[in-house]
Amino acid sequence: MMKRFRLLSVFAVAIVAIGTLLVSCSSDDDKQEPNTITNNKGTYKITSAYIMDLTDQYSITLTAHPGNGVKATILKTDIGKRIDLSKRGRWKADSPTVVANGEVETLQSGSYVHVKSYANGQISISYCLKKSDGNGSRMEKGNYSGSIRYGTFQNP
């Protein structure tokens, strides 16, 4: 009887965890505070934003303290498009929570980067990164709308 109860308990926890991952990134900015990054450690205010021109791509870095941030690299032609990170492509995502290179791997369904606009030193971006592997399930999401500096290399 105890084995059955224990198995049911583990199964219930797994269902709740999977359900949380599936709905966590359901929409661009559902219940996400403006200009923040949220991961399994908490929610952090974005303190700076940088963009680098890499010929046919942009590398966008959003930093938040302490030690949180994200760097997304996308094609310039993808500005205004929602990029599905569960499909291969010329994109990269790098954060302390999730790292992926779209040319060699993909992220879980529901993962995306959406640079809604970039012009005149202003940017609007939202993203959700979900990955499950031998290290467990991880999720990070964020959004930022505001000024962005053209800069040199920045670690997230």
Where are these regions (language model features)?
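Surface-exposed helix/loop patches within compact recognition domains
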Residues: G42-N120
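N-terminal non-cleavable signal-anchor helices
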Residues: F11-A17, S24, K116
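Bacterial N-terminal signal peptides that target proteins for export
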Residues: M1-A12
